[in-house]
């Protein structure tokens, strides 16, 4: 036998051994059934979602869920008013909405992930049907009367029970149940129409594919790894960039030397879904305003913020406006530095930084002044190592264990399913799916989705949660693994924080479990966790050059990263404040008879608060937060102030961001209660004191001389 034959046989044997080892490891992987006994011991239930496999099954599941829910509502409404109880009314309503939402949550995942367009369409229709039903149950007068009859007995409730009754009655008032029947019906119809339009708005964004062809010369400055990425090279000197794929868009914006290239891609991205969504958004704004006015509110801002920490639209606007003013000196200083770079680059002393320039020149500044090369840094962040490292950190500080288990159904081959247990007691706490890379038709941002929320079930057992993390990190490229940017790593730590918030919940009722907290607080715990990836001690636990794992990120680079972050804070935060400002402005008081022009309202704000734009663009048509976070984007900045304050607990702890005592305190005082108590109480219990704005002002570079301009950032008093 020749040497070649020997080599071939050897390779063949190796492949057989490798394949057999993979079979063994798959066979050894546990299933959810292996944890059911431990769950039962803790009086808990673990549930793998029963995923529908056909469009008809999706539609049937939703119809069945709604029919069962309606039958339960009939039973609540048919009770003798003199015999109603807390359990038979308020708790029963929480049970009904929870059960129906399970089918809607499954449909949402299918809508956002499935590779089959027919499945996605069926799921979209199912979600619309659920949303229509969910609006309608607010107007079940028989159910309302049963709950009101119980409330009129002036029951002696406390804690979470009292909160559930109070907020249920508040929801009815906000739905218009105190209005005359004809006016109430009008509000109901308006809300149903708004719900359908919101689903259309989201779907139009997901469907917006935008391939843009460039030559290699057009893309001068981009790293070779980008050109070698799957799907980029599509012809002889033809490179296709998907403007709707965030990592591709950002890579071009940060690295392309050619301003025309950056502008072209920016304009295309900022006009995605323009024709479909601008009229839809204008209709949504009109409906929101009409609903708010009919319910007795001055604006949709006021309606939305009433149930949040800000309490009024005026408070939210004042907070953002004061931050805009407070950060002005820093923003001006940073902008002047970027303009100097562009002037030198273009030989035009009057060159202005446009909105398609800031990423590129910030990147150049980081390289030149701080020796921070974003592309070079990616070598330290291979996806699997980052994921494993994050798991190790969170398992340690939160007292948890994550174990990969068999997923009975996969909507994509690389889907992963993990089970979470308490590391001390072995109690199963919940499960999470990971769907981490982009593909056509998939949700195109980064988010955690509820599938099964935590809740105390009618049988006395506790339903442990199941969630999904849907992300769009750069895929593997040939022999090179998926390499993440530092921002990607920050995003992963943030989004997985939401998953943990959901999974470890101990709230009794579904409406209070996990991340079901006020919208201007929900981001705070995860924004705090972003601090971890800026800390050398934390990074050393997982970040290493994939080509030589013995090489950690040098301390000097981490130091420069932090310096660059502070140096860019003015630009980055002014951008966030611009989004918050336009969102609030769109939902400000508005004459009922006056049509909306969302672009005419929002584009000038983008220019005034941030940077000059191309007038043909329609940022709002692709700004998904306008459905779901409407009149709520300010909450990122509001929560950021809380997050910066909460981070000080770790910063002062013995082991810093890796401190187990601080981690367990976060789990017990913030994650587990959810919204079962006032979040102000949870925050103060975690801090051990009243809240302070100082850490946030320091974080964004507002010094003592600027504090008067930012004096009304959220404090205990303003909340």
In which residue ranges do the predicted regions lie?
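C-terminal, non-catalytic "cap/extension" segments appended to globular domains
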Residues: 32-60, 64, 367-368, 385, ...
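Short pre-active-site segment immediately N-terminal to the catalytic Zn-binding motif
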Residues: 474-492
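Active-site-proximal, well-structured secondary-structure segments within enzyme catalytic domains
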Residues: 164, 193-196, 203, 208-242, ...
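N-terminal helix-rich structural modules
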Residues: 28-230, 239-240, 650, 656, ...
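Bacterial N-terminal signal peptides
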Residues: 12-22
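Short His/Asp/Glu-rich catalytic/ion-coordination signatures at enzyme active sites or charged loops
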Residues: 41-57, 107-126, 147-189, 242-278, ...
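Bacterial N-terminal signal peptides that target proteins for export
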Residues: 2-13
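Boundary at the C-terminal end of the N-terminal hydrophobic targeting segment
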Residues: 24-26
């Amino acid at each position: 036998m020749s040497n070649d034959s020997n080599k071939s046989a050897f390779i063949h044997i190796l492949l057989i051994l490798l394949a057999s080892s993979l079979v063994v490891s798959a066979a050894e992987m546990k299933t959810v059934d292996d944890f059911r006994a431990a769950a039962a011991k803790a009086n808990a239930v673990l549930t793998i979602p029963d995923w529908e496999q056909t469009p008809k099954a999706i539609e049937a599941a939703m119809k069945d869920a709604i029919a069962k829910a309606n039958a339960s509502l009939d039973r609540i409404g048919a009770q003798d008013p003199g015999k109603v109880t807390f359990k038979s009314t308020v708790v029963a309503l929480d049970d009904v909405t929870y059960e129906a939402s399970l089918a809607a949550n499954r449909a949402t995942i299918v809508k956002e992930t499935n590779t089959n367009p027919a499945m996605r369409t069926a799921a979209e229709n199912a979600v619309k049907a659920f949303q229509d039903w969910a609006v309608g149950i607010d107007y079940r007068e028989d159910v309302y009367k049963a709950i009101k009859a119980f409330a009129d007995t002036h029951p002696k409730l406390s804690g979470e029970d009292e909160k559930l009754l109070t907020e249920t009655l508040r929801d009815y008032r906000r739905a218009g149940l105190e209005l005359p029947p004809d006016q109430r019906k009008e509000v109901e119809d308006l809300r149903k129409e708004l719900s359908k339009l919101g689903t259309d708005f989201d779907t139009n964004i997901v469907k917006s594919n935008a391939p843009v062809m460039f030559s290699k010369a057009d893309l001068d400055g981009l790293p070779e790894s980008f050109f070698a990425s799957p799907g980029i090279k599509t012809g002889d000197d033809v490179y296709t960039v998907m403007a709707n794929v965030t990592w591709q868009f950002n890579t071009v914006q940060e690295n392309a030397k050619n301003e025309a290239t950056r502008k072209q891609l920016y304009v295309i991205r900022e006009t995605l879904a323009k024709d479909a969504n601008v009229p839809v958004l204008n209709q949504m704004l009109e409906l929101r305003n009409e609903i708010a006015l009919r319910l007795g509110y001055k604006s949709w801002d006021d309606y939305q913020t009433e149930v949040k920490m800000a309490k009024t639209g005026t408070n939210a606007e004042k907070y953002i406006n004061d931050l805009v003013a407070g950060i002005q000196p820093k923003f001006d200083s940073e902008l002047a530095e970027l303009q100097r770079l562009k002037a030198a680059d273009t030989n035009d002393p009057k060159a202005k930084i446009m909105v398609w320039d800031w990423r590129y020149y910030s990147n150049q500044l980081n390289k030149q002044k701080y020796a921070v090369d974003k592309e070079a840094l990616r070598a330290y962040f291979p996806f699997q190592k980052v994921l494993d490292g994050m798991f190790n950190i969170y398992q340690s500080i939160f007292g948890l264990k994550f174990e990969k288990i068999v997923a009975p159904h996969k909507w994509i081959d690389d889907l992963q399913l993990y089970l979470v247990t308490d590391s001390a007691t072995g109690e199963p706490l919940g499960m999470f799916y990971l769907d981490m890379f982009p593909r056509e038709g998939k949700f195109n941002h980064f988010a955690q989705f509820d599938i099964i929320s935590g809740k105390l079930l009618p049988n006395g057992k506790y339903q442990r949660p199941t969630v999904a993390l849907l992300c769009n990190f750069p895929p593997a490229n040939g022999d090179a693994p998926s390499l993440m940017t530092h921002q990607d790593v920050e995003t992963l730590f943030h989004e997985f924080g939401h998953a943990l918030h959901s999974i470890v919940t101990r709230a009794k009722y579904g409406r209070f479990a996990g991340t079901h907290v006020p919208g201007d607080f929900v981001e705070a715990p995860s924004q705090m966790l972003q601090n971890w990836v800026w800390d050398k001690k934390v990074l050393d636990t997982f970040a290493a050059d994939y080509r030589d794992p013995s090489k950690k990120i040098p301390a000097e680079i981490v130091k420069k990263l932090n310096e660059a972050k502070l140096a860019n804070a003015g630009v980055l935060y002014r951008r966030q404040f611009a989004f918050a400002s336009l969102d609030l402005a769109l939902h400000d008081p508005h004459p009922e008879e006056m049509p909306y022009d969302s672009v005419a309202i929002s584009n000038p704000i983008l220019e005034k608060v941030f940077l000059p734009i191309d007038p043909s663009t329609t940022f709002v048509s692709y700004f998904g937060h306008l459905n779901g976070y409407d009149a709520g984007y300010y909450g990122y900045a509001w929560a950021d102030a809380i997050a910066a304050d909460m981070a000080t607990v770790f910063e002062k702890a013995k082991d810093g961001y890796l401190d187990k005592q601080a981690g367990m305190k976060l789990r017990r005082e913030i994650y587990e209660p959810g919204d079962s108590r006032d979040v102000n109480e949870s925050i103060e219990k975690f801090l051990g004191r009243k809240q302070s704005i100082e850490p946030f002002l320091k974080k964004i570079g507002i010094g003592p001389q600027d504090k008067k301009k930012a004096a009304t950032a959220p404090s205990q008093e303003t909340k």
